[in-house]
Amino acid sequence: KPDVTKQVGKPWGGLGLRVDVRGFQWNNPQARDAIFWEYSIANVSDYDLRDVAFGYWVDNGIGNDNADDIGYFDAEIDMSYSWDINGVGSGGLPTGIMGFAYLESPGLAYDYQDNDGDGLTDEKRDNEPTAIIGATEGITDLSSFLEFYKLEVEDLKEHWDADEDQDWQDGEDLNGDGIYQLAEYYGDDIGIDGVGPGELNYNGPDADGSECNHMPDFVEGVGCEPNFNTTDVSESDMVGLTSFRMFPVPSHAASNETEWFKNDQVMWNLVGGDTLEEFEGNISNLVEVFASGPFPLFQGRVERISMSELHSYDPLAGLNSGTHAAPALYELKRIVQVIYEKDYRFAQPPKMPTI
């Protein structure tokens, strides 16, 4: 497709995927030990891709002392982590933990199943709001929904149909002039630029009328209001972690049987298979495979996937125990998940009052 990509002097090849990648890191005390990675994967080919998987093939080499690494996974929070079994790296320096976690894994919005166990079936992050529906409409398993989102029945409310998890908040235009004043609560109804009155870079109501229109707004590739579609990870029916493997670094030979990333069929079997296995072999130089799938990627569609690279120090006694306890790492995962779901809006001091 020369109208999409140009490879000078070479024919078009490959799957026809366009991948945008962004990495984020902050010096905020809550998140300075984590790196956020966002992937936007678009199918720009002429075909539907029925089975796709996304994952990492990693030669960890913790502490540059790679002969004694080990790792573990937790499918409930979509995280894996590895460490040096004696906690000593090159030059005798202490080593920590390196973890990978899905903050947002691929979504399966067309299989008529509740893949993430939140009581919703086939929720999406790109559907348009069409009507306000009842408090329990759209929920397939009420008890699972309440447990997953930590809600009570009385917390449920009438909501826009495309806001499946009911967290988009309308504003209160008290004087009815169609514009939120600083003294009025604007909630999430701040327009697709994502900036509300009194916030940095606010230049007035959105020209397209999406601010103060009392409905969630989203335009693909342009913007979105908070807690809706692209800014609300919970509105995806996520597959989660489906494949975790660790094995000794294989031969570099270009064999169709070697577990090496240059061998397509072998790699598909690794990342596309539903295989979650704890490594119980001899401690050595190990490769880690961490993946999610399969999922369909239809022509013209975009799949959003977000990862976090996590680092912590946890006691070796817990790591090398049967439970592989890593409390500091688990707490960091909890924190970065909240940060991601709040669209990287860290805790801030109160706004300066107007006198």
Show where each model-derived region lies.
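Extracellular/surface-associated beta-sandwich interaction domains
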Residues: 1-355
